[in-house]
Design a protein with these regions (language model features):
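Family-specific signature for flavin-dependent thymidylate synthase
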Residues: 1-283
Length: 283
């Protein structure tokens, strides 16, 4: 399973709209800028100033130990914000949009998130685009999430017969050809292909159908190829979603028995800005 070309859009618009109900735009303290590959200290200073602002209400330390602890906390926050700023949406080859959320906006965002779906509408305005390559059996589950998601897929109907069918065309990340076949007091492990000619026999059959169809253009061969194609077949889709979709998917699927959902949740945690605060609740 692969995730490629992840892009995140519209933090600025979502956070601005978040403040519309109370006309509190003047309280916004987040920063958004376009970085055109310039090594400008201004960007770093902006991030570090934002990091310090999280601690403006903290009392002055009374001891050296308290000062050291405060300095460490500020440094941790600054480093975190710097990491978040690096996870950015690329526009063209040399321009990058970066977002750093200030403490005022973060406090309001968390309060709205805790209030439930009717209050956290701003999450629906943070958009994500990603290319996902996954097996058909996972896509069948993903397709239950229809509202707010759109996917453009590579075509099995049009392109299935255009390239050789090999094991690489299927999901095999956790494939194990040794399975416990019999349910008895002393279960034994047997090679799966000894019983159902998988995977070599199945691959040979599919490839033979593909070749025969290309030779004859007889659609009966193509139909049998479609009929017997396993659910492990890998398909790539360009998917657009929003943070509210992703929040629902993450919390509903994080303990799912399909390992592909675990990979999906790891992508959310590791690749999406502010996922800990807005999606996973791990902040």
């Amino acid at each position: 399973m692969e995730f490629e070309h992840t892009q995140v859009f519209n933090f600025e618009g979502a956070l601005r709209g978040m403040r519309n109900p109370l006309n509190s735009w003047h309280k916004s303290d987040s920063a958004t800028w376009v970085d055109c590959d310039m090594d400008d200290e201004y960007y770093d200073e902006m991030i570090y100033d934002t990091g310090r602002s999280y601690f403006n209400d903290v009392e002055m330390p009374a001891t050296e130990e308290e000062q050291d602890a405060l300095d460490e906390a500020i440094a941790d926050k600054q480093n975190y914000l710097m990491d978040q700023a690096r996870m950015a949406t690329t526009w063209g080859e040399h321009a990058t949009v970066r977002n750093v959320i200030g403490p005022n906006d973060m406090k309001l965002a968390k309060r709205l998130i805790a209030g439930g779906g009717e209050h956290r509408k701003f999450l629906r305005q943070i958009f994500v685009s990603v290319d996902i390559t996954a097996p058909l059996y996972w896509w069948k589950e993903f397709d239950t999430y229809k509202v707010g998601t759109t996917a453009n897929s590579t075509s099995t109907m049009h392109k299935l017969a255009s390239t050789p069918i090999t094991l690489d065309c299927f999901e095999t990340d956790d494939y194990n050809d040794m399975v416990d076949i019999f349910n008895n007091p002393s279960p034994m492990e047997y090679p799966l292909h000894d019983f159902i000619s998988c995977p070599d026999g199945l691959l040979d059959m599919l490839e033979s159908l593909r070749v025969k169809y290309n030779e004859t253009k007889d659609k009966r061969y193509w139909k049998e190829l479609i009929r017997w194609l396993p659910n492990g077949w890998l398909q790539t889709r360009t998917v657009t979603m929003n943070y509210e979709n992703l929040r629902n998917m993450y919390h509903q699927r994080k303990n799912h028995k399909l390992t592909e959902w675990h990979s999906f949740c790891e992508w959310v945690e590791e690749c999406l800005p502010y996922s800990a605060e807005f999606i996973t609740d791990k902040a």
